[in-house]
A protein has these predicted regions:
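N-terminal, membrane-interfacial amphipathic/helix-forming hydrophobic leader that caps
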Residues: 1-118, 133, 137, 273-324
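Alpha-helical transmembrane spans of integral membrane proteins, capturing the lipid-embedded, hydrophobic core
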Residues: 22-26, 78-84, 117, 121-133, ...
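Juxtamembrane helix-loop-helix connectors linking adjacent transmembrane helices
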Residues: 43-74, 93-206
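Transmembrane helix-loop-helix hairpins at the membrane interface
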Residues: 155-324
Length: 324
């Protein structure tokens, strides 16, 4: 039988090439986001100086339309810098840098995404997009259309999709997955160990992962339901996509930690919409039209190709681990 490392190398060359392209696109999305918020008319009658206290999410609270001086632009920059810091951190660690990780797959057929966060991010992001596309294709063949929530203002919507990953990962991963895992599997109770396990649940000594998988699936279903449960939410067609996405993010958090799940979630929100709004603004077309632009089709094609290779390598790696 052929050397498994040679076969992984064969798949690894196009796979790492695609991951490198995705990495470059992720990097470029950072300045694109700044450009959209501060240099375009995305908000129409409002701009980045719009008070954060006037957002509808604070309606019926004492914070709503208060004198607190903080604008959408201020909070966006804070979020942007936070994501950028985590992004840079993910390139460098936890054990080796991104370039060395992809080089190892090409040169030696060594495949271990745990060595670098960015390797895991680009790989699992591709898998998530691939599965979401398959779900969408199947649902549309049965006449189930996924309709996004109607946003009153594109600037506010872009702000929300930038904020959502941080809030949702804190609630659905750290609180609803991380803490139960610690309660079930921890043999120590120090604060430092608790925080370490919330950051990277794989730090726990988990010999039987059945309970962990149940928690991940249950929270994934709750994550899917949360996307359709409210009046201004997605249509029912989003439930399956969001549920599977929640399960994948939960699994990724369980295996690799909050850095990976957070940045994958960020990419599915900020990254996608940054390119779509950029196309919309420079071509003076609607957001819906922008999503049909050849550039968005090219992005989707890159994701799907990378996702197919990622799944193929996962299957090959598991097969050879069992047989060699």
């Amino acid at each position: 039988m052929q050397n498994p490392n040679k076969i992984l190398q064969l798949f690894g060359i196009p796979f790492t090439a695609l991951l490198s392209v995705l990495f470059g696109l992720l990097v470029i999305s950072f300045p694109i986001g700044i450009y959209i918020v501060f240099e375009t008319d995305i908000g129409d009658d409002i701009n980045y100086d719009y008070p954060i206290t006037h957002l509808d999410i604070f309606h019926d609270t004492n914070f709503y339309q208060s004198s607190f001086e903080l604008s959408i632009g201020d909070v966006f920059v804070i979020l942007w810098m936070f994501y950028l810091a985590i992004f840079v951190f993910s390139i460098l660690g936890p054990k080796q840098n991104f370039l060395k990780s992809i080089s190892s797959l090409i040169s030696m057929g060594i495949y271990d995404v745990k060595l670098n966060y960015m390797f895991a991010i680009t790989k699992w992001l591709s898998v998530l997009v691939l599965i979401s596309a398959l779900i969408n294709f199947i649902q549309e063949s049965f006449g189930i259309i996924t309709v996004p929530p109607l946003g009153d203002n594109n600037l506010i919507q872009f702000f929300y999709v930038s904020l959502a990953p941080l809030l949702e990962e804190f609630v659905f991963r750290i609180i609803l997955v991380g803490i139960p895992l610690f309660v079930l599997y921890s043999s120590r109770s120090s604060l430092r160990y608790f925080l370490k396990c919330l950051w990277t649940p794989s730090s726990l000594n988990i010999l039987d992962s059945k309970k962990a998988i149940f928690i991940i699936i249950f929270v994934g279903i709750a994550f899917g339901f949360a996307h359709i449960a409210f009046g201004d939410s997605w249509s029912e067609g989003k439930f399956a996509q969001a549920t599977v996405g929640g399960i994948i993010l939960g699994w990724v958090y369980f295996r690799y930690g909050i850095v990976v799940s957070l940045l994958i979630h960020w990419a599915t929100n900020y990254f996608i919409f940054a390119y779509a709004y950029f196309i919309s603004q420079i071509n003076y077309v609607s957001l819906e039209t922008a999503f049909s632009h050849p550039l968005m089709f090219t992005l989707e094609l890159i994701f799907l190709s990378s996702g197919i290779l990622a799944v193929s390598i996962l299957i090959l790696n598991r097969f050879y681990l069992k047989n060699f």
